[in-house]
Design a protein with these regions (language model features):
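Short, low-complexity N-terminal intrinsically disordered segments enriched in polar/charged residues
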Residues: 1-29, 124-126
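Hydrophobic alpha-helical core bundles mediating ligand binding, dimerization, or RNAP-core interactions
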Residues: 7, 11-14, 27, 51-55, ...
Length: 126
């Protein structure tokens, strides 16, 4: 079970933009990550490679400070907002909930929930 300080350190790493480093430093070796109802990706190395590839396609990824962070035993819920600017300069926003199950001080499972009708809508950079 993570303590709140450990979760806040994870959130700060993501907000700083070090998404791949956050996976390296805060996820279990056998962690899984799942988008809405798609099949989960499994294994920390797979998760880091997927994140690095996604970020490499972008000009910029801005992570807003978490809107809410709830910690209840091994369960953590974070409301993230991401602004992704593509190579042509168009910025799109994702507002999602990440539901995590921690094992000790690392994330074992994470699933993202968002409204597919509004996900990645075009916004002014912010």
């Amino acid at each position: 079970m993570p303590d709140r300080k450990r979760v806040e350190t994870f959130v700060a790493a993501v907000v700083s933009g070090d998404h791949v480093g956050a996976i390296r430093d805060f996820y279990c070796e056998d962690a899984s990550m799942q988008e809405n109802a798609t099949e989960p990706r499994r294994g920390r190395d797979v998760l880091m490679a997927h994140e690095a590839k996604a970020l490499a396609r972008l000009k910029r990824m801005h992570t807003h400070p978490a809107r809410a962070v709830l910690v209840d035993g091994d369960n953590v819920v974070i409301n993230w907002v991401f602004d992704a600017t593509d190579q042509s300069g168009v910025t799109r926003r994702l507002d999602e909930l990440a539901i995590q199950r921690w094992r000790g001080d690392r994330i074992a499972e994470e699933r993202f929930f968002y409204d597919t009708a509004t996900a990645w809508r075009v916004v002014e950079p912010g």
